[in-house]
Amino acid sequence: MTGAPFATRLRRRDLLIGTIVTLASPEVTEILSTSGLDWLFIDGEHAPIDFLAAQTLLATARVPCLVRVPEATEAMVKKALDIGAAGVIVPMVNSAQQARAVVSFCKYPPRGVRGVGRVRAQGYGFDFARYMASANDETVVVVQCEHIAAVEAIDAIVAVEGVDAVLVGPYDLSGSMGLLGQVEHPDVLAAIARVAEACGKAGRALGIFTAEAAKMKPFIAQGYTLVAVGVDVAALGDAARATVGTLRG
């Protein structure tokens, strides 16, 4: 990987195109990371990917990877960073207090409470000095806005120093509004627009997931830069179905 660090590109709001990884397959991760994507979203929340499997994926990836942890706890965040993730995506961050805690988990003292171990992130100790000198600045902190409570608190959340980006979760957000799955409902779109407005004013990068590239284009036009399009299992299934359809059509 060459050029500016991933954290720098994210903070200056370059367009960063990624996809979600749910398969604990290093081959899939390697293939995806050589396809022109800027980053990979390793899903440790919904997918059956534990930290050992995630570390294997990180070892084969050729682009920066953000690991979504199962929950916003110090232990989960620490493990994700220790195995070598470029940063974390933390679900259900619904208040500034939660956001401050997440940032603290990601930063070494005196900026936070992250513990130190001899781990993959710093070359098992052999790259300790370099990693420790840069980790606080280069570790990416992404909080998810996927509940109406987070929308209501979004101005305070984006004001938290150390929050690099807000990733909107449309499906869970719609569910919290009593509109599960209705991601294009006017009320859901208005809530998402509220988040976008707050991020724009605060200078925070803004991210979102869509299942299809065509549905992502309008969001990019609106200023979304940390974008995740599709899921590995969907790409695999779609390709197989297309092949069968072509041959039997």
State each model region's role.
Residues 1-249:
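Expand to "…catalyze enediolate/carbanion chemistry for C-C bond making/breaking, isomerization
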